[in-house]
Amino acid sequence: MAAESDVLHFQFEQQGDVVLQKMNLLRQQNLFCDVSIYINDTEFQGHKVILAACSTFMRDQFLLTQSKHVRITILQSAEVGWKLLLSCYTGALEVKRKELLKYLTAASYLQMVHIVEKCTEALSKYLEIDLSMKNNQHTDLCQSSDTDVKNEEENSDKDCEIIEISEDSPVNLDFHVKEEESNALQSAAETLTSERMRMQSPELSAVDGGFKENEICILHVESISTDDVENGQFSQPCTSSKAGIYFPETQHSLINSTVENRVTEVPGNTNQGLFSENSDGSHGTVNEIQNLDENFSLRHQCPRCPRGFLHVENYLRHLKMHKLFLCLQCGKTFTQKKNLNRHIRGHMGIRPFQCTVCLKTFTAKSTLQDHLNIHSGDRPYKCHCCDMDFKHKSALKKHLTSVHGRSSGEKLSRPDLKRQNLL
């Protein structure tokens, strides 16, 4: 017990910050630097242990190669990457609001998780502020429109006559309405009916299902294929023979949001054959409606369901339900995070996997493994239809398609196997 009381414990709370400051000072003096990072031809002198501790991407680079020179190509400016690496020493990062998405993309590529979290929080905060401002503007517009409606109702109440009905009153009551107003309303109704019958085509009459002017329906175009949507080309306009009114369960939330915003979103050129009925009974294209307020257009369309989103954070939250990963650079989605990381490396032009024999570089580890089969002579990919084997998986797929006429996922039945063996 006496020996334990002689032990003194010291805790240096500022040790980490002091060490980083001294390491940054050594970096500025180019002392003990063991690696040079080239970001779009901009050099950054640093220490591998510091960079590897802050960036998973840099750690993998240092494990794959022992070179003292690492080259990184990013689509953002070199200043963005340089500041990200500098933050490994300073523990601070200054980001302009308009460049927040650039830093988020570059930090995602360098796999600097702590910076990605901060940028995501800041981005969500600013987007919520913008959304609240737009909602306030929309509320003001709604209030002004409600005021106009109330004024119209008050004016209409002045022309109405209140009739009290008692028990002694006869069953058939004659309501005394001004004759001139009755004639005017009747003539206006006849004119509106004839105008609608003249403007409405036979094709659109088949689509009309008795809905009121303010009701919302969704037109489902069955003739449009996925390839046509991606290419933005459509063979013909939407007609009644190709369109049907339906309300699937997957679109309930979309219908609710459409009712709240009173906005219809039609992607690409599909709106060339769609028509909407105005309040006066005339027909106009959807383009004319969308031109009234382009700020409410849905910029992000979910690839798995018909949902569309205006803001990035809502779109990202929705993709988590489908277990999808989004590339912030081009908007492409992936089912696995490793495929997203490989895709981002393709954007940046980075080939982190290098062959130790010929020093050739690759974007994916699987491609490097196939390449190593050339040096080792291994042929691990075997055809289940015959006895041939291949070094590369792509060669096996090509063999199955050209020789056996089937994909790699298909398997032969027993009669087919016997026939192949006889051949």
Swiss-Prot record:
It is found in: Nucleus. Pfam families: BTB, zf-C2H2. A zinc finger (C2H2-type) spans 300-322, 325-347, 353-375, 381-404. One of its GO terms (molecular function) is DNA binding. Keywords: DNA-binding, Metal-binding, Nucleus, Phosphoprotein, Repeat, Transcription, Transcription regulation, Zinc, Zinc-finger. The keyword Transcription applies. The modification Phosphoserine is found at S201. Residues 33-97 form the BTB domain. One of its GO terms (cellular component) is mitochondrion. May be involved in transcriptional regulation. This is Zinc finger and BTB domain-containing protein 6. It comes from Mus musculus. The lineage of its organism: Eukaryota, Metazoa, Chordata, Craniata, Vertebrata.
